[in-house]
């Protein structure tokens, strides 16, 4: 499915998926997440001009409507957000990680770890 804009929380997997798909976002970070990591995730994406952040305490129907209408009505900004989001995304991250693990494990081929007591 293709989306012009996502309105969502800012957990790590959500942010990563949006980046890989190049989907601009309005993030409403969950304020009670461990170590406030959702706010950190959202603010980073906002600092990269890939997203907008609305703190939950500021969220009203009018606020969200104004943000959505403003973004949907500004195709240049939405395209720039899409471009920035895509630049952040790592669509081949799993492949890169698998290759790195393969290289590391090759270094230890035949090595049997000694138990520690």
Where are these regions (language model features)?
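Nucleotide-activated sugar donor-binding and catalytic core shared by glycosyltransferases
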Residues: 1-117
């Amino acid at each position: 499915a293709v989306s012009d804009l996502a309105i969502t929380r800012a957990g790590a997997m959500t942010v990563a998926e949006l980046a890989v798909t190049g989907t601009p976002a309005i993030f409403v970070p969950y304020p009670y997440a461990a170590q406030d990591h959702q706010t950190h995730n959202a603010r980073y994406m906002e600092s990269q001009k890939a997203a907008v952040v609305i703190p939950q305490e500021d969220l009203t129907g009018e606020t969200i409507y104004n943000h959505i209408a403003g973004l949907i009505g500004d195709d240049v900004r939405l395209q720039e957000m899409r471009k920035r989001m895509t630049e952040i995304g790592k669509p081949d991250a799993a492949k890169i990680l698998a290759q790195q693990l393969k290289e590391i494990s090759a270094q230890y081929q035949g090595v049997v770890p000694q138990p520690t007591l």
